[in-house]
From Swiss-Prot:
The lineage of its organism: Bacteria, Pseudomonadati, Pseudomonadota, Gammaproteobacteria, Alteromonadales. GO terms for cellular component: cytoplasm. It is an enzyme of class 4 (lyase). This is Tryptophan synthase beta chain. SUPFAM superfamilies: Tryptophan synthase beta subunit-like PLP-dependent enzymes. The gene is trpB. It comes from Shewanella sp. (strain W3-18-1). Pfam families: PALP.
Length: 396
């Protein structure tokens, strides 16, 4: 048995703020993860699934028409091409293998845009695990294609009507369920947030994104990019891209939060720049709170970014200045969604469109030869009806 212990904190952020009943389950998970990371057979099986089931490595595509500046190259890391349609599949396969290693028979998950739910459903179908997915009722309505996909693959999808009926409420219900079933079930958390050891586990299973990007950039350009850019909700696709570049000081790390209707309105989801530190979802992290410390509702056109907090490592990277966090509005994301489709023939997820929007803005302002890499974290099939309704002037 390994004696290695993971650090539960990133600076002042992170920790394990959960009911005492869940502490043994989290410690069991930490031990299993550490041992798995030292087990060549586990790593070989995970790598094989990523390659021969999920389709890694994913392409690094140089856009031909997106950049508004001839001095700026914009590359896309194509996680939209991964089986399941988004980056979520990477770490879900890892956690599902961990669950089997621990002898668990059931998986509990939460989902916002439905991409994590789809990834969890496909992993459970593949590995013979029972699957239960909690999803905010609003998200069930706006992500009906993904709901059908989950059910088609055998998952039980449970709409959550409490609170704002979005991702944070689905997270709360999933955690509540796990509190009573952890002996037989594994909670397969979908982002790099929540109680320790989830932020570290998710980062390590998503790290492949940045590792591949670094290798591909050196092959294509003979150097590292000037910046890597990713959207940030909970933060898993961004930390997957950032992880292998954190120790490369020449590479700027840029996260893009959802500004919603505008940062100066109550309708946004940007806790890193506009939140206050608090305890939520088992961790200490920036949180959208009112003057009395109550959790404020987050808002984003993209269900996957509609979250009032953020992963603790992003909070630490922001606090230390290693990463820079910007924001993009609904309108900017919608414009980028259409622009990428028209310019490159690629339909991005609305989440990813936030990062595209900022990359185009940044490219416009560059005054020297620059290489940007955007993590195209998912494809936009799930969003076409939402966008169509908005463009046709319907209420969404």
């Amino acid at each position: 048995m390994s004696t290695l212990k993971l650090n539960p904190y990133f600076g002042e952020y992170g920790g394990m703020y959960v009911p005492q009943i869940l502490v043994p389950a989290l410690k069991q998970l930490e031990t299993a993860f550490v041992e798995a990371q030292e087990d060549d057979d586990f790593k070989a099986e995970f790598t094989d699934l990523l390659k021969n089931y999920a389709g890694r490595p994913t392409a690094l595509t140089l856009t031909r028409n997106l950049s508004p500046n001839p001095m700026v190259k914009i590359y896309l890391k194509r996680e939209d091409l991964l089986h399941g349609g988004a980056h979520k599949t990477n770490q879900v396969l890892g956690q599902a293998l961990l669950a089997k290693r621990m002898g668990k028979k059931e998986i509990i998950a939460e989902t916002g845009a439905g991409q994590h739910g789809v990834a969890t459903a496909l992993a459970c179908a593949l590995l013979g695990l029972k699957c239960k997915v909690y999803m905010g009722a609003k998200d069930v309505a706006r992500q009906s294609p993904n709901v059908f996909r989950m059910r088609l693959m055998g998952a039980e999808v449970i709409p959550v009507t409490s609170g704002s009926a979005t991702l944070k409420d689905a997270c709360n219900e999933a955690m509540r369920d796990w509190s009573g079933s952890y002996e037989k079930a594994h909670y397969l958390l979908g982002t790099a947030a929540g109680p320790h050891p989830f932020p570290t586990i998710v980062r390590e299973f998503q790290r492949i994104i940045g590792e591949e990007t670094k290798k591909q950039m050196l092959e294509r350009e003979g150097r590292l990019p000037d910046a890597v850019i990713a959207c940030v909700g909970g933060g898993s696709n961004a930390i997957g891209m950032f992880a292998d570049f954190i120790d490369e000081p020449s590479v700027e790390l840029i996260g893009v939060e959802p500004a919603g209707k505008g940062i100066d309105t109550p309708m946004h989801g940007a806790p890193l720049k506009h939140g206050k530190t608090g305890i939520f979802f088992g961790m200490k992290a920036p949180l959208m709170q009112d003057s009395e410390g109550q959790i404020e509702e987050s808002y984003s056109i993209s269900a996957g970014l509609d979250f009032p907090s953020v992963g603790p490592q992003h909070a630490h990277l922001n606090a230390t200045g290693r990463a820079r966090y910007e924001s993009a509005t609904d309108d900017e994301a919608l414009e980028a969604f259409q622009q990428l489709a028209r310019c490159e023939g690629i339909i991005p997820a609305l989440e990813s469109a936030h990062a595209i929007a900022y990359a185009v803005k940044m490219a416009r302002e560059c005054t020297k030869e620059t290489i940007l890499v955007v993590n195209l974290s998912g494809r936009g099939d799930k969003d076409i009806f939402t966008v169509s309704d908005i463009l046709n002037g319907k209420e969404v």
